[in-house]
Amino acid sequence: MLPADQAGIPPCQGPRARSAPISFAIPKGAWDTHLHVFGPTAVFPYAEKRPYTPPDSPLEDYLALMERLGIERGVCVHPNVHGIDNSVTIDAVERSDRRLLGIIKPHRVMTFTELRDLKTRGVRGVRFAFNPQHGSGALDTELFERMHGWCRELDWCINMHFAPDALEGLCDLIAGAETPIIIDHFGRVETAAGVNQLPFKILRDLATLDHVWIKLTGADRISHSGVPYDDVVPFAHALSEIAPDRLLWGSDWPHSGYFDPKRMPDDGDLLNLVARFAPDVALRHKILVDNPARLFGVI
């Protein structure tokens, strides 16, 4: 592990410089619906309160990854290390030559006028990240209700990232939403207890709802077996039987929060998982192309 900085905040690893070759034909118009941009911190400093300090992973590095993987469109999700200043994400979206859309972090002083302006600049939703890794294990329900109403007016989505033990308490809120809800990283349900564990049963129930979308992202974060993530495949198959038209794929680049370089996932390995998640080419096309294009109105 790298030494902590003067504030005692541990630095985490950056992404791999190279990626494994892709094992299947990437369809034209493929999307990566979950990526982050960090820095450069000389221009976009990190929030003082943060769980770790990642190295700069600027837009240019991600665009190079898109070229290597054959991805055409992406969704830049605002990272917690940048706090409530969404500038880094908005800048990336605006400089991406219309290849990226943005998901921002909401806060209590935001106004509807501000959000309406951000829609013209490529933003398409907000994200509530309240898992313990991000320093908070509770949802700000008052802010959620306010943003829910505004997102409904703007035709935006709400991304949610939480610990799996929060699923049961969130059921009514998610089920009652009137705007698309995207659950990140398989709901963070870890694979060790199998597909019959209660959190995954709850996730499957939520996946039956027409406004609930599931990101098949973060396989490296929920797997107990590690590369090639065999234990994640049954979870993806179970979800594809329920919601084939509301599954999304994302890289989660640059994979923040890893302190051991040996655990840093390979972006090629993660994309190759799609062929195992969806052996059927038509389903694969839905996950990579049709579903995100429909959700984000790019059809």
UniProtKB/Swiss-Prot annotation:
It catalyses: 4-sulfomuconolactone + H2O = maleylacetate + sulfite + 2 H(+). Optimum pH is between 7 and 7.5. Approximately 30% of the maximal activities are still detected at pH 5 and pH 9. It comes from the Bacteria. Monomer. Its EC number is 3.1.1.92. GO terms for molecular function: 4-sulfomuconolactone hydrolase activity. Involved in the degradation of 4-sulfocatechol which is a central intermediate in the degradation of substituted sulfonated benzenes. Catalyzes the hydrolytical desulfonation of 4-sulfomuconolactone to yield maleylacetate. Its cofactor is Zn(2+). Keywords: Hydrolase. Belongs to the metallo-dependent hydrolases superfamily. Sulfomuconolactone hydrolase family. This is 4-sulfomuconolactone hydrolase. The keyword S-adenosyl-L-methionine does not apply. SUPFAM superfamilies: Metallo-dependent hydrolases.
